[in-house]
């Protein structure tokens, strides 16, 4: 098991908050939030943060948990978001961004923090997955954030699995991002998620020469009968769909 953290980002001028999760330090996570807000705000929260000045926001720890997979952490995060995350796109209570005429880059007087930690009720995994895969308001960046842990680990692991900017969506990878159970069902669920968000992918057959580029595909083939191999397909995704928005 490893440690994960649920955090809240508050400001000193209103009661709107952002809920997030991380396996990195809160300091590093907050630093990335501020960098995204200043350089490339692409979501409700970062747009709000940039408008009102990043120095008017502060990050606080809500809960430290022991987790088996990243999905465990995000299931807990989604419950906090449902109850409190007014600046989160997923379940956020600000459907349309309304930015008041506040001065930017000026630290305002600190008000009493609105947020108090309350343990939320945990919802079923399938309910969260259904929301994630059917909610049209979730951007690709937020979709990736839901499943993929911090980028330093993400980049290292994916680079090891990548060939010519493409990655094989193996059973190991699906397990890593939180999928469980039968591999075929895992893969089919993941394909639905990709289609829902218009993310292109390929499916290789056993006679495709590209299969030779992926050691894990060759290992899979070695453990299958000829009849099963001829009917099998291997899901391939462009790595840039994960790394870049």
From Swiss-Prot:
Regions annotated as coiled coil: none
Family matches, as SUPFAM superfamilies: GIY-YIG endonuclease (SSF82771)
Cited InterPro entries: GIY-YIG_endonuc, GIY-YIG_endonuc_sf, MSV199_dom
Domain GIY-YIG: 2-97
Pfam families in the cross-refs: GIY-YIG, MSV199
The name this protein goes by in its record: Putative MSV199 domain-containing protein 146R
Native organism: Invertebrate iridescent virus 6
